[in-house]
């Protein structure tokens, strides 16, 4: 009886192994069509790790980014921030800010104050 059970177990294991080997080694009778993915597309899909997607975006900057950088270097005057303040308004604003900071630092009992630059900006060392 013991011999019969060993033979039966060995036969059963061989049968399972043979079935699995043939199932995974044969090609499908009706293979599925593989979708062609566009290699030029860099973005995050459902199965893409977000860190890998960000790496792809950092490695390949977009055309708009490159054009923007070139435009900024060759035409800097277009990207300057327009201000309505004249030089007199700037001086008045800096003097009023200096008065405010003096009062503020006296209220805060600052240890040391020193004036730097010709515009009168106050720099405190606490």
From Swiss-Prot:
Keywords: Mitochondrion. The keyword Mitochondrion applies. This is Protein FMP49, mitochondrial. It is found in: Mitochondrion. GO terms for cellular component: mitochondrion. It comes from Saccharomyces cerevisiae (strain ATCC 204508 / S288c). The keyword Mitochondrion applies. Its main location: mitochondrion.
